Design a protein with these regions (language model features):
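Thiamine diphosphate
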Residues: 1, 24-180
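Flexible, glycine/proline-enriched loop segments at strand-loop-helix junctions
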Residues: 3-10, 162
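Conserved glycine-bearing catalytic or ligand-binding loops at nucleotide- and phosphate-handling centers
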Residues: 9-24
Length: 180
């Protein structure tokens, strides 16, 4: 990617609006990704975002795993964690580049598995950036990256494509149970 390029994806309309405001105040290239399909709309809730800072959405003291993801999956996973009392931490990596090294290092020091859940290609994506950061900081943490392999993906509805790739939320939760 371009030097000093910022890549971000909000979890809902408020975050996307805040990212737009932030992008206009920057001098470096700034890409805001948006999902195919719909996104949660919440016009009555303003939010602030700081460049390169992630959001700790769910912080469970008794967590078995930390899930790092971004986009509209954050809201869906948060609802599942809260509704089903799942012992998971959830981090919204709304900045895919640059990553929040400070928060990432603190998560890695919990000595719990980290699952990076993306809807994008694995090579060169968020998971690779996370591994690079942990390596740079000499942290050996169990990191699992769930994303799209280096393949051609058939077209279809978002849900059908995710199911065919094993990237639907049920597959995520089954994977987490298999490693914990």
């Amino acid at each position: 990617s371009l030097p000093n390029m910022v890549i971000a994806e909000g979890k809902n309309s408020s975050q996307i609006e805040a990212l737009l405001d932030l992008a206009f105040s920057q001098t470096s290239p700034f890409a805001i990704r948006y999902p195919r399909g719909s996104i949660e709309y919440n016009c009555d809730h303003k939010c602030d975002v700081a460049l390169g800072k992630w959001e700790f959405v769910v912080n469970n003291i008794d967590s078995k795993v930390s899930i790092i993801t971004y986009g509209n999956d954050v809201c869906k996973i948060e609802k599942d964690i809260n509704d089903n009392h799942l012992p998971y931490n959830l981090i919204n990596a709304l900045f895919i580049k640059p990553i929040d090294e400070e928060l990432l290092v603190s998560i890695a020091r919990l000595n719990k598995p980290i699952v990076v859940y993306t809807n994008d290609i694995i090579k060169g994506g968020l998971g690779d950036s996370i591994l690079e950061c942990l390596n740079k900081n000499h942290i050996n943490a169990p990191v699992y990256i769930l994303g799209v392999d280096d393949i051609y993906v058939k077209h279809g509805s978002v849900l059908k494509v995710k199911e065919s790739l094993g990237l639907d939320l049920n597959s995520l939760y089954h994977f987490i149970e298999s490693i914990c």
